[in-house]
Amino acid sequence: MNKETRFPEHFDIPLFLKNLPNLPGVYRFFNESGNVLYVGKAVNLKRRVSGYFQKNDHSPRIALMVKQVHHIETTITRSESEALILENNFIKALSPKYNILFRDDKSYPYLMLSGHQYPQMAYYRGTLKKPNQYFGPYPNSNAVRDSIQVLQKVFMLRTCEDSVFEHRDRPCLLYQIKRCTAPCVGHISEEDYRDSVREAATFLNGKTDELTRTLQHKMQTAAANLQFEEAARYRDQIQALGIMQSNQFIDSKNPNNPNDIDLLALAVSDGLVCVHWVSIRGGRHVGDKSFFPDTKNDPEPNGQDYAEAFVAQHYLGKSKPDIIISNFPVPDALKEALEGEHGKQMQFVTKTIGERKVRLKMAEQNAQMAIAQRRLQQSSQQHRIDELAKILGMDSDGLNRLECFDISHTQGEATIASCVVYDEQNIQPSQYRRYNITTAKPGDDYAAMREVLTRRYGKMQEAEANGETVKWPDAVLIDGGKGQIGVAVSVWEELGLHIPLVGIAKGPERKAGMEELILPFTGEVFRLPPNSPALHLLQTVRDESHRFAITGHRKKRDKARVTSSLSDIPGVGSKRRQALLTRFGGLRGVIAASREDLEKVEGISKALAETIYNHLH
């Protein structure tokens, strides 16, 4: 069981170090405000933590961190591998300023074959649940969708939602273009469809040769029985598999039983660090992705430290491959922790030959190219920020974080305000926020803007007053004209804020590139040239705010309309409404349903089905 050690009110670091145990565990460094600076793990807490205060050979990042340490907390663990897992959990939960962080806001997607009687092939992101089958993870959503398109051509599995599948009375377009066998209307037997599902799973598991032999046998049997159309279908499948197999990763170490393999290539150049991840599942290269940690607090990054941090954050508590091939060593404690979670032995390979060596070299080249591209991108983004800083009369070093607000509604219905964030030279989707407008009258954009600005920045003031760390924007962008920007100025006066404001209005022509910028504190209203880097930055953030607001508004509006349409029907309460929507996949499905279909829903009598049908028609 973990044992916590916490700091006294007046923390004495030398005394604390003297009493530390010679045991494995995790330590946390805090600054004077109580914010976590750094989380680390140790085989020997006393030796490791004392080293920070007794040595002078730290990297610039660690040296800067040590100067700010006010107090320390430790947690004793049973082993180094347990400490490593706990360290990773703390890092993910606390996001310490001086830890190496590979930010990835979403879980990785999978290709799913559902547990339905006629399984659906689908893109999936979330908790893995039985009896569904999952294949992956894939580096991004496009990799999953590309795989689905390929599998549709060969195995013709359905991709429609269960609610649609169960209420079709004729095949859809995918059947006509030979991408689905239309099990929804009985054009294929359950047994034959399940054969196709098994074949798809066999392919996804990398057993392409086995699948090809099975299909060849089926083709020969069909031809012998004079079923030439069916034989031709098997022939086409075999040919398609041959094309796909030519693009496969053939592992010279194990060519007949492909493993799940990840290749990791580390590259470090001029203060930038990149880890390039290549995902191979069942012998197929399903995608790759480059990861860049934040190195702004570390002018001389140590590549091995970053590589180890990536492996811990990328794999602990997540799906793992059978083999990790990398151009850097993985520490024994980390190997032990990964294998403990995986439940079986994993291979960690750094010396490669054959196809493995070729693929790892390609991954290294991709990592180096990604760094070059990142450097160009940073140069371009910095140029945009420099130009905007000049316009605002600011030092470009003081202009990093922008927040932009927009209001969206349909004639006053379902009003939503959006706040999007641009920081660290990129948009930050994980920091976006939507606000349901509750106090403003329908259609009153000015009151809606007042509400969202007051709520967001009033709450930030309260948090800061309570000692919490708050990220204030360096400038705030308002999507709107003089009316909206006037409201923002009023809120600023009420809250005592001194953050620069920029209004961006479409102008009389309402054309892109012809926007008017409003700087309320100087009274300036002007246009920038269409090729202005500063204008491009403002347009990017403004357009993202508009997109985020309108998608949120549409979801809220559509949900309200569905609820309203069914709630008006006598005898349909929340449970029956939900049962109808679940069964038919939404309001359109309910409207399209016959009286007989409605009767089949639990809780819907014949008389109520008649009432619902008449109300909707």
Swiss-Prot record:
Keyword annotations from UniProtKB, A to Z: Cytoplasm, DNA damage, DNA excision, DNA repair, Excision nuclease, SOS response
GO MF annotation list: DNA binding; excinuclease ABC activity
Signal peptide start and end residues: none
Subcellular location: Cytoplasm
Main location class: cytoplasm
PROSITE patterns: GIY_YIG, UVR, UVRC
Highest taxon in the source lineage: Bacteria
InterPro entries with a match to the protein in the record: GIY-YIG_endonuc (IPR000305), GIY-YIG_endonuc_sf (IPR035901), GIY-YIG_UvrC_Cho (IPR047296), Hlx-hairpin-Hlx_DNA-bd_motif (IPR003583), RuvA_2-like (IPR010994), UVR_dom (IPR001943), UVR_dom_sf (IPR036876), UvrABC_protein_C (IPR050066)
Domain UVR residues, every copy: 209-244
Family of the protein in this entry: Belongs to the UvrC family.
Quaternary structure, from the entry: Interacts with UvrB in an incision complex.
Function: The UvrABC repair system catalyzes the recognition and processing of DNA lesions. UvrC both incises the 5' and 3' sides of the lesion. The N-terminal half is responsible for the 3' incision and the C-terminal half is responsible for the 5' incision.
Protein name: UvrABC system protein C
Species the sequence originates in: Neisseria meningitidis serogroup B (strain ATCC BAA-335 / MC58)
Lineage of the species this protein comes from: Bacteria, Pseudomonadati, Pseudomonadota, Betaproteobacteria, Neisseriales
Gene name for this UniProt entry: uvrC
